[in-house]
Design a protein with these regions (language model features):
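A broad detector of short, well-ordered amphipathic alpha-helices
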Residues: 71-74, 159, 163
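Conserved AdoMet/S-adenosylmethionine-binding subsite of the radical SAM
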Residues: 1-146
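Flexible loop/N-cap segments at domain edges
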Residues: 151, 156, 162-166
Length: 169
């Protein structure tokens, strides 16, 4: 079997405060940025908050019209990490710098989420990045066109992912 590394403060991100203080700028991103865009922001952003929505490129195309999403997003995230390094928390418990990878759990897409978690565990050591698992998906807009995602995430789906996170380290 594969050895899994813990993801650090995987589910405790809600207790981490993110600051926008003097010298600490953050960037909420879709995760679908080009490396060139990230390079242009070097030394301007201390806290990156990229989304990593899909590990499945077919789902990325189907739901977001984003071909080559996973490769583009993971390359962007690695580039962000190279710029700011491991996350740093100051003496007041505030996040000063780092990368928080956000992932929204979607209904009927458990494998997508597990592969996102695996990618993070395979590419970062404990203490390097933070992970924010979000489960507040609310179907709206064109979601009605896709019955498989036209509902909220169940407690059972969330618990399975939560258990996977805790067992992965």
């Amino acid at each position: 079997g594969r050895i899994r590394r813990p993801l650090g403060a995987a589910l405790s991100i809600g207790t981490t405060k993110i600051t926008k203080s003097e010298g600490s700028n953050r960037s909420d991103t879709s995760g679908f940025e080009t490396v060139d865009t990230i390079h242009r922001l070097k030394n301007k952003i201390q806290i990156w908050l990229p989304d990593l929505k899909y590990s499945d490129d077919l789902a990325a195309i189907k739901y977001s019209n984003a071909p080559n999403y996973f490769n583009t997003a993971t390359t962007a995230i690695k580039t962000m990490y190279k710029q700011v390094g491991p996350y740093q928390i100051d003496e007041n418990g505030l996040l000063k710098s780092g990368v928080i990878i956000r992932h929204l759990l979607l209904p009927n897409m458990l494998e997508n989420t597990l592969r996102v978690i695996d990618w993070i565990a395979d590419n970062f050591e404990p203490g390097q990045v933070l992970f924010s698992l979000m489960h507040q998906y609310i179907p709206c807009g064109r979601a009605a066109e896709y019955p498989e995602i036209n509902r909220v995430v169940t407690a059972e789906e969330y618990q399975k992912v939560e258990q996977y996170l805790f067992n992965s380290g």
